[in-house]
Curated annotation (Swiss-Prot):
PANTHER family: DTDP-4-AMINO-4,6-DIDEOXYGALACTOSE TRANSAMINASE, TRANSAMINASE. Pathway: Bacterial outer membrane biogenesis; LPS O-antigen biosynthesis. The gene is rfbH. It comes from Salmonella typhimurium (strain LT2 / SGSC1412 / ATCC 700720). This is Lipopolysaccharide biosynthesis protein RfbH. Gene3D superfamilies: Aspartate Aminotransferase, domain 1 (3.90.1150.10), Type I PLP-dependent aspartate aminotransferase-like (Major domain) (3.40.640.10). Belongs to the DegT/DnrJ/EryC1 family. The keyword Ribosomal protein does not apply. The keyword Secreted does not apply.
Length: 437
């Protein structure tokens, strides 16, 4: 039997295993867990991961190349670089803007980055890690995104960038944010880690800014276990991001390749001797943030299902929102940003001030009913313990940010949930509020 025959046999056995082990289990109310997020994988994902492992090419290779190309086609950008997580993607995106190759536009310590405090820490942390000052403005409820009308008041001569996330897949007001970025010559980074497939005015989010990022953690729209990607329309920024990702080296050869530039031994950079091997010449203080080809193989299979996943998220969101209309005396339900079509990551809920309900009581009740909940990440980031010694600036009041910290949580709408799950969720909310009983 040849190696190829064995590969085919292994692939068939993997498919048989997947069909047996990964088939959805029947939903049993009160017994089955309704998680806030999760992965949906099947035979193709396992088959491609096994195929990648049989290749024996452990770092980025043919599967990664195919994944980057296909993701770029889906988003509508020419340059995609995979990395180890969405947080790493954010770190690379922001750090790239500190490159001396950008001349006067390079971010320098003490420069300011406008953002929000109601979100995930690693949207903001890269600014701090690069010696920059985060400047916080408040958000809007029920979109949970930056209140774009407050941004211009935050702009000073030190302002150099805007870096914000599309909260739980709901696009922020891109037309206004883009207008302000253009007016004041600010870089714009779109954190799309929770928003793969979201569009604004019919255009994919992540393509309005200078750089976009996405995450492939199991909770997200598609997964490769861990993993993320940075993407851009700019060839210059692509090379800088790649350098920071790959140890800071000036060379951009793919793994296993040499002399792509044709000048490997023909350059003199820094105070190195003439002809010093370009493969070991470093122009940035970089990292090693690449993924394995097995991860990319899983992601490639997931990309074949991304449109299906996005549509199911939208359908689950609409179904749940319709079901929870019975509870609007107590709950403020989410709204899509005008001109956006969100690929929802989760379903955010805020308790109304008049509800007379404590959030802890409600989420504890849901937890006991096996319905998973999550808070809106850090709540108000500046109230987190690690922010005690961080230098930052706040413009105006963070009233809604504090309200989110105290009264908001979210529940799941990921593609692994069926209408049976969602009907059960609605029934438990109604039971808690004493409705329809």
């Amino acid at each position: 039997m040849t190696a190829n025959n064995l590969r085919e046999q292994i692939s068939q056995l993997v498919a048989q295993y997947a069909n047996e082990a990964l088939s959805p289990k029947p939903f049993v109310a009160g017994t089955s867990v309704v998680p806030p997020s999760g992965k949906v994988i099947g035979a193709k994902e396992l088959q491609l991961m096994v195929e990648a492992s049989l290749d024996g090419w452990l770092t980025t290779g043919r599967f990664n190349d195919a994944f980057e190309k296909k993701l770029g086609e889906f988003i509508g950008v020419p340059h995609v670089l995979t990395t180890t997580s969405g947080s790493s993607a954010n770190l690379l995106a922001l750090t790239a803007l500190t490159s001396p190759k950008l001349g006067e536009r390079a971010l320098k310590p003490g420069d300011e980055v406008i953002t929000v405090a109601a979100g995930f820490p690693t949207t903001v942390n890269p600014a701090i890690q690069n010696g920059l000052i985060p400047v916080f403005v408040d958000v809007d409820i029920p979109t949970y995104n930056i209140d774009a009308s407050l941004i211009e008041a935050a702009v000073t001569e030190k302002s150099k960038a805007i870096m914000i996330a599309h909260t739980l897949g709901n696009a922020f007001n891109l037309s206004e944010v883009r207008r302000i970025a253009d007016k004041y010559n600010l870089w714009l980074i779109e954190d799309c880690c929770d928003a793969l497939g979201t569009t604004y005015e019919g255009q994919m989010v992540g393509t309005f800014g200078d750089i976009g990022t996405v995450s492939f953690y199991p909770a997200h729209h598609i997964t490769m276990g861990e993993g993320g990607a940075v993407f851009t329309k700019s060839g210059e920024l692509k090379k800088i991001i790649e350098s920071f990702r790959d140890w800071g080296r000036d060379c951009y050869c793919a793994p296993g390749c040499d002399n792509t530039c044709g000048k490997r031994f023909g350059q003199q950079l820094g105070s190195l001797p003439q002809g010093y091997d370009h493969k070991y010449t470093y122009s940035h203080l970089g990292y090693n943030l690449k993924i394995t080809d097995m991860q990319a193989a899983c992601g490639l299979a997931q990309l074949e299902r991304v449109e299906e996943f996005v549509e199911q998220r939208k359908a689950n969101f609409s179904y749940l929102k319709q079901g929870l209309q019975s509870c609007t005396e107590f709950l403020e339900l989410p709204e899509a940003t005008e001109k956006s079509d969100p690929s929802w990551f989760g379903f955010p809920i805020t308790l109304k001030e008049t509800s007379g309900v404590n959030r802890v009581e409600l989420v504890k009740f849901l937890d006991e009913a096996k319905i998973g909940t999550r808070l809106l990440f850090a709540g108000n980031l500046i109230r987190q313990p690690y922010f005690a010694n961080v230098k930052y600036r706040v413009v105006g009041e963070l009233t809604n940010t504090d309200r989110i910290m105290n009264q908001t949580f979210w529940i799941g709408i990921y593609p692994g949930l069926t209408t049976e799950h969602l009907d059960y969720v609605v029934s438990k909310f109604e039971e808690f509020f004493g409705l329809n009983f």
